Amino acid sequence: MEGKLSMDSQILEEVIRSGNIPCHGRTGMLCAGGGLLPPALLDESRVPKFYLDALVASGGTSSTALPNTGLVYNLMGTSGLPKDVLSHIWSAVNRAKPGQLTRPEFFSLLALIALAQKGESLAALCAMDSLPIPYLNPVQAFPTASNPAPTTNTSSSFVPFGKIKPSAFIPTSLLPRRSMRKKKESDSKEVSAHNSPAKGAAHDLAGLDFGSDISSMKEEIKDINETPTQSCWRETVHAIYIVVEEANQLFKDSKKEVIQEISETEKGSAYFKSLSKAFDTLERVCKSAGVQLSVQSTKEAEYCRNLRRKWETFMDTTPEQNVEMTDDRKCAICCQPVQNPIDYGGQCFDVTCANLWVNGVSSTLPSLHLK
């Protein structure tokens, strides 16, 4: 009985950790507003002055201004943490809008950096009355009331993706999914990585760790005759495949009754709703691609469909009613009429497709310029 409870506990924990399946309008498996941290700790009247100074230094100069993404990236770089740890922290807190932190999310980011620096897990917050203070070097980056720093930001604090210089730690996916796209490193490197305190902190933040057995599929070699649109479809299908395969690794050894129980919880229901959105995006892409879909992408799509049929009873298949759907433009990714449009770089994207792309493929949306 103890083993069964342990398995159930692991599944629930992994469902919570894997809540970063990018879908529009979903707050994920986390608390509203700031993501991983209790909302009470993120109240601006309670956060340490250090947090408010850091917010001002990052572009949040008024009571409603959001932090400047480019400045936040620079601030993260002063923490001394490895780039993959910073990437995971960003993915954990960036919930509301890809590439732009809200003010509570910014506070969450600072708190997770502090925990990672100390090698502590999220559980440590239970014993804290206020948010931990991270070490950021140089501290001169934060202006004080007596010596305010000049600002050159004359417009909005939001920096569009296209104006942000590429950063090696900008998250393109959760770390477990990112690892599925990489080759296995040598044993010596793996031992070194596991012995690193910073890596241990990242593992604490990540929750359960998948084994390397789910990384057996190699990334398909790009066809030299592939058009930009076909490449976009291939990348999108593969990103969905990775999301679905991660879910399969989570549930494949679980009994149907256990999965059913999870699907009836608030967090489990949101998880399966997110999977359902990923499946819907897959069908939109396949409908546009038709016979132009590559052989490998076709295999991945069929694999996903088989699992969708297997999990159909756990997912709410009721179509969402969108009374505001009056836009007849097509999404630059799936090439189907947009349901929740977002404009970027002179193109129109469906929000679900855009979030999937930013979290699973690249931090920059594709430039296809559909007519």
From Swiss-Prot:
Region (Disordered): 179-205
PROSITE patterns named in the record: EH
Domain spans labelled EH: 43-148
Superkingdom as given in the UniProt entry: Eukaryota
Residue ranges that the Swiss-Prot or TrEMBL entry lists as coiled coil: none
Stored CDD domains: EH
This protein's name: Uncharacterized protein R10E11.6
The organism of origin for this protein: Caenorhabditis elegans
Species classification: Eukaryota, Metazoa, Ecdysozoa, Nematoda, Chromadorea
